[in-house]
UniProtKB/Swiss-Prot annotation:
Pathway(s) of this molecule: Purine metabolism; AMP biosynthesis via de novo pathway; AMP from IMP: step 1/2
Cofactor: Mg(2+)
Region of interest: Disordered: 1-54
Keywords of this entry: Cytoplasm, GTP-binding, Ligase, Magnesium, Metal-binding, Nucleotide-binding, Purine biosynthesis
InterPro entries documented for this protein: Adenylosuccin_syn_GTP-bd, Adenylosuccinate_synth_dom1, Adenylosuccinate_synth_dom2, Adenylosuccinate_synth_dom3, Adenylosuccinate_synthetase, P-loop_NTPase
Protein name per Swiss-Prot or TrEMBL: Adenylosuccinate synthetase
Binding annotation for Mg(2+): 181, 210
Length: 710
């Protein structure tokens, strides 16, 4: 079957591209998923997230189900439990609760998700095998042999690399280049330490972002809205008016850390006229969000209030109570309306809040629960803000942040804009629009929110990515991930510690199985096509699909969990297809964090293209282009949106590791030549994305960075 593609360097007659899939396997595309025999099919108001490779195809597969799926986006559906037997070959069941449906539920729903109950398995199921059988005949793309020349990278100093860029610009933006959690803190800290960089600012988003920083004494601080520069003497830190803030949470969780550590923030932390995240915004988030889709920080609801001009800003709290009451009363209509539609009482809301906190992680604060219980909710909030904010002597100073940043630039000082989340989590990016945050967290969004004159002041973007173990947390498509984004939540795994400690605990063995068996022809250039085989990994706890094993092992071994939610992040390969667009929009500079992880890998992988394949033969129209089975999407082609990306499978280029020549700061001699594997990886990323790599992270400490000569 001829391959159809969209733009790029190659056409349908290029060697290794035409007839990308074996016609004997794909003619007519007969493969289609079927629910397990005897189970009730899920009925939803929209297509389920089509992660086909994890669908249980037959009754034999279904017999091994024991997961505890959570709620699917905005719907609850009935599910028949086939069996709660442990995963195949296991000695004992995993410590996740089996799903139980309430057949007598008057609403016709249950607490279980039929899609995930029938779709996800720990082991390799028949559906995964069928997908692989269709793709295994894909002809190797010529790009798998690129780049032909491996660059040599030499180490240089901070002063001769990063600081030259800082000194040539007025506004420096540090931005996430993937889906957040890229390790931006090191680069922020390095830029902030420059003598001319006097102002560090957060200019949008809210406490759904999170970063961990350490002071010189080694004390740990976890900040969400507070800029990282608070720990550096002589720096002024700002939270701009386009940010959204829960001032009670900000005082209780962030400012209290500074107070307890004896850090004087009075002349170093300033807050603009931010939009206020109220308790009802957080409850709206809880009541209206799908499992694993939100940090429960009220982001979407408060941005809704902001756009509708119905909410309150910080200045309202510091002025007359009557105006505050009227605005709160009007804005709260949305909350009361949702309770009415869902037929929920205050007691129901309190119960749901306590259920959310039942595992010991406080996702819904006490004062939010107290609000839900309050009879006069408006008066409750007026008093809450009067006592905890307006009359709180510890509340930081307020100012016109835009004016102060502009004044600093006119004095010749540098301004650092600390980007929350990332490019692909930005609400302004249509590709992942349904699973993004609610602010524009691209570099363009940062600059717009700062309200600094981009024609007057010279700006630069420092993009940050992470490899190996590029990760995403939350729902949505991510073709390069080892498992679907909702895989962990479907097992009722809310935090990293919910993962059974003995499961896939031998990271060394798991990664070896992936690269040895998952890519059986990796050493044969004529046969390696970059498609991962659905092989299995076994340990004393059971047998697991290699993608599942790598997802669990990576999350545990690398400590990959959300800084805010503690949810396990889903790891995968560095994605050149996605980063090419990031580089086009806000490149070319890139720093790669955590590259010393590669010291423990036999090989490292980078996704250089996707192949579109839907066993049902489903076609997806994106921006007027219809994606069909066999389409190849290369780095440099337009990135399709999520409806198509759910059907995309990664084509992975493998690069030999550097175990014998580790780069970790604790093991490497400064200025020692970088291993060939590192140079090959960096060369591949630069080749496929056109970026310019400034530095690589090689350890946990703030100064564990190798700067590269340009």
């Amino acid at each position: 079957m001829p391959v159809r593609r969209y733009g790029g360097r190659y056409n349908s007659s290029s060697p290794g591209v035409s007839n990308a899939l074996n016609p004997s396997r794909t003619a007519g595309w007969p493969l289609s998923p079927s629910p397990a025999t005897g189970s009730k099919p899920a009925s939803t108001h929209h297509d389920p997230v089509p992660q086909e490779a994890y669908y249980v195809k037959d009754e034999a597969d279904a017999r091994h189900q024991q997961q505890a799926p959570l709620r699917e986006p905005s719907v609850e559906v009935e599910v028949e439990i086939i069996d709660d037997e442990p995963p195949r070959g296991s000695q004992k069941p995993l410590s996740v609760a089996p799903c139980t449906a309430n057949a007598n539920n008057s609403s016709g729903g249950s607490k279980c998700n039929a899609i995930t109950a029938s779709r996800y398995t720990f082991y390799t199921n028949a559906y995964q095998k069928s997908v692989y059988e269709a793709l295994r005949s894909l002809r190797p793309l010529p790009e798998l042999q690129e780049p032909r020349r491996v660059k040599e990278y030499a180490e240089t100093s901070l002063k001769d690399s990063l600081y030259r860029i800082v000194e040539a610009h007025d506004v420096i933006m540090v931005a996430g280049a993937f889906f957040g959690d890229e390790g931006k803190g090191k680069t922020v800290d390095a830029v902030a330490r420059h003598p001319l960089c006097t102002c560090i600012a957060r200019v949008n988003s809210g406490e759904n972002a999170g970063h961990t920083v350490y002071d010189k004494a080694g004390r740990k601080f976890v900040f969400n809205l507070a800029p990282s520069g608070l720990l550096l003497p002589g720096k002024r830190n700002y939270i701009g008016p386009e940010c959204v803030m829960d001032p009670v949470s900000f005082m209780e969780k962030e400012v209290i850390q500074l107070i307890d550590a004896g850090i004087d923030y009075r002349d170093r932390l300033f807050i603009g006229n931010v939009c206020i995240v109220t308790p009802y915004h957080k409850l709206l988030d809880l009541l209206g969000s799908a499992a694993n889709s939100s940090t429960l920080k009220g982001m979407a609801p408060v941005h809704g209030s902001k756009v509708m001009k119905r909410g309150i800003r910080l200045d309202h709290i510091f002025n007359d109570d009557e105006t505050l009451r009227k605005r709160l009363e009007k804005d709260m209509d949305t909350y009361f309306g949702l309770l009415k539609v869902k037929n929920l009482s205050d007691a129901d809301v309190v119960r749901l809040c306590r259920e959310e906190n039942s595992d010991g992680v406080v996702r819904v604060p006490d004062y939010v629960i107290a609000f839900a219980q309050a009879e006069d909710k408006v008066e409750f909030l007026v008093k809450l803000y009067r006592d905890r904010v307006r009359h709180n002597p510890g509340f930081p100073a307020r100012c016109d942040v835009t004016y102060e940043l502009h004044a600093a630039l006119l004095r010749g000082e540098k301004v650092l804009l600390e980007g929350p989340q990332s490019y692909w989590l930005s609400n302004a990016r249509t590709k992942f629009w349904e699973s993004t945050t609610s602010a524009d967290t691209t570099a363009a969004g940062l600059l717009a929110a700062s309200q600094l004159n981009f024609q007057k002041f010279k700006s630069v973007v420092l993009n940050v990515h992470k490899a190996p173990g590029s990760s995403r947390v939350g729902i949505g498509a991510c073709p390069s991930s080892f498992v679907p984004q909702d895989y962990f939540s479907a097992q009722n795994i809310k935090t990293l510690r919910d993962l059974p400690s003995a499961t896939c605990a031998h990271f060394e063995a798991v990664q070896r199985t992936l690269f040895r068996d998952g890519f059986p022809h990796s050493n044969d250039k004529a046969r390696h096509n970059g498609i991962m085989a659905p092989v299995e990994y076994s340990d004393e706890t059971g047998t697991y699909n290699i993608g599942v094993a790598m997802a669990i092992a990576s999350a545990q071994h690398h400590g990959e969990c959300g800084a805010v939610t503690k949810k396990p992040r889903v790891c995968g390969f560095f994605d050149c297809v996605l980063h090419h667009e990031v580089n086009n929009i806000q490149g070319p500079y890139l720093t790669i964090s955590a590259l010393d992880r590669g010291d423990e890998y036999d090989k490292v992988g980078v996704t250089i293209a996707y192949v579109y394949y839907s066993p049902e033969g489903k076609q997806v129209d994106v921006n007027g282009h219809v994606y069909k089975n066999g389409d190849i999407i290369r780095a440099g082609d337009p990135v399709p949106s999520e409806p198509a990306l759910y059907h995309c499978h990664p084509i992975v280029k493998l690069i030999d590791g550097w175990r014998d020549n580790p780069i970790a700061a604790a093991k490497r001699r400064r200025n020692a030549p970088l291993p060939r594997g590192v140079c090959e990886l960096l060369s591949a990323i630069e080749y496929f994305t056109n970026c310019k790599i400034l530095s690589i992270g090689n350890g946990p400490n703030g100064d564990d960075i190798i700067y590269l000569r340009q």
